Every structure is written in C-alpha cells, then in structure tokens.
A protein has these predicted regions:
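Feature marking well-ordered beta-strand scaffolds used for ligand recognition
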Residues: 1-225
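Soluble extracellular-acting proteins and domains
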Residues: 186-298
C-alpha cells in the first residue's frame, strides 16, 4: 500500500525487487496497509480515509469509503474482487475507518482481524474474496457521548491463540474467539496450534504452518465442509469419530493399524469432482491431513 495506490513487487531476488503490477481506486483516499492471505493468492488493502481522525462509518457514509479492497493475485496481476466495511453504523462522535490487522490462522479459511478505531474490531472471512463476511466483532462504543475524542483500536493482532487490541485511550484489550455458527471449537483449536515462527511481526507475514496430521486441523476441515453443505452430516460424523479415535491413540502414545486403515479409506473417499473451488481445496487438505494422521498411528 503506497498512499496513492496499491503496488505488487516480485521480491524473488531481494536485491533487485521488480514492480509487476499496480492498481488505482478512485474510492480510496489513503492506501494504508496491505495483508496477504497465507497462500499469497489474495491481498487485502485498507483505506485509512482522513488519517483515522474523522467519523467515516456513519449511516450516511458510503460502504466503499474508508473500507477494505480485496484483490486476487492472478498470474502476478491484481484483480479486484470486493470491498468490505464493518456493517454496524457508528456515530458522529466516533472516529472510524479501516486500520491495522493481521491474519487469523484457521486452516481452510482466509480470516483477518481488523481495527476500525472507535468502530471496534471485526474478524472478516474473505475465503470467498468476492463475498467477504464479518464473523465476529467487538465494539466498546464512543469514548465520549457528546464530542469526538480521538480513540479506538489502532491495531488488532492475532498471536498464539489470542487477539490483542491496542486502544488509543482505554489501553490494551485481550480477546479469545468464541464458538459460534461461524466458528467451531475445532477451528479455534486448529488456530491455536498454528506455527507463526519464534517471532511475530504482522508486517513481515511469514508463512504459517500447522503440525502434520493434527486431529484438530482435520476436524476443522470437516466442520467447514459441513457448514458449506459440501459434506453430509452423516459422513461428517464418521470422519469425526475416526479422527477422535486417532487422537486418543496419540494421547496414549500408542499405535492402531485398524484406525489408521480407516483414516486412509476415508481419505480416499473424498471426491472433489462436484465440489466448488473452496470445498475442493478443503477436501484436498483434509485428505492430506488424514493420510498424515494415519501414518502417525500406524
């Protein structure tokens, strides 16, 4: 994000970075930050309209001002997909605009936790980059009921299972995700085992990985497939029971060839031929995770 536009560079050779594409948007006032998804196939730009000091989330404000712009990266080029702005209108007394955030490492999903100054905090699902959705939020309300005092979340960052929100006036808030219709216990558990490296700097964005054959990762994929209606509940129950049996073997540091073979069989049953792109990706990742889990207990 370069204030007046968004630019993508090829940094394969860090000593000779090459500019390969750039985008302009007349609705963007100040291109403030850019965050890639973990696969590096998408980028989310934030527009800090007015430098973050003014109300820009009132009912009268356009939903594409002071918002995010989400682009897919296709053959090295940026292709616009959608805007996202927090859906809850704010008052004249609340400075509100898109600001700093970071990826929430749930496997199989592209999630971003974002600060909106006095607009609070949003967790955004942009797995479908053309249809981003808010799946969680927190909002303290205005610092003062009658006049605008600069405040709110400057940044919200995920680290080691928690979200840290730096509130300009009211200090540091620490959050955990709650189970909901849009976030399962298994997804939260899978995010907690993500490896972000020994040090975390959201501006560097090192690739996040998960332990091979981790039961919570497998169950997270199953939950996602059920939620998107790509897997019947009856099938999901069989997958969950088998993965849970494997998890018990791991907890007891034991082996079980029968459960291992069942995991391999379930992996081979996954058919992506009729699945959409997102479901197919999750099935493929689930298949790999089941095979890795099978090897761990064989």
């Amino acid at each position: 994000a370069c204030s007046g536009n968004g630019v993508i560079f090829d940094i394969s050779d860090p000593y000779k970075p090459m500019r390969i594409d750039d985008v302009l948007d007349q609705k963007f006032a100040y291109w403030h930050s850019a965050t890639f998804n973990n696969d590096g196939t998408k980028v989310l730009f934030t527009d800090e309209w007015g430098g973050g000091s003014r109300p820009r989330c009132r009912p009268s404000d356009p939903m594409d001002w002071g918002a995010n712009a989400i682009y897919d990266i296709v053959d090295g080029k940026l292709e616009f997909r959608s805007y996202f702005k927090l859906p809850a209108p704010q008052s004249e007394q609340e400075n509100c605009v898109a600001h700093n955030g970071s990826v929430v490492p749930v496997p199989g999903r592209d999630l971003f936790v974002q600060a909106w100054y006095q607009g609070g905090m949003s967790v955004i699902d942009f797995t479908d980059s053309a249809n981003p959705t808010e799946i969680a939020y927190f909002d303290r309300g205005p610092v003062h009921e009658e006049k605008l005092i600069l405040g709110g979340y400057w940044s919200t960052y995920w680290y080691d299972g928690k979200i840290y929100g730096t509130e300009i006036v009211r200090g540091l808030d620490v959050f955990e995700l709650n189970v909901s219709d849009m976030m399962s216990e298994n997804e939260i558990a899978a995010a907690a085992v993500a490896d972000q490296g020994a040090l975390f700097n959201p501006q560097q964005q090192f690739v996040v990985t998960w332990p091979k054959g981790d039961p919570s990762v497998a169950l997270a994929f199953v939950d996602q497939l059920v939620r998107s209606e790509a897997m019947p509940q009856s099938d999901a129950t069989e997958y969950a029971e088998t993965v849970s049996a494997a998890a018990q073997e791991l907890a007891e540091n034991s082996k079980n060839r029968r459960v291992s073979n069942k995991l391999r069989s379930l992996a081979s049953d996954l058919d992506t031929s009729d699945a959409d792109a997102i479901a197919a990706m999750r099935m493929t990742e689930l298949k790999t995770t089941l095979q890795d889990l099978a090897r761990r207990i064989r």
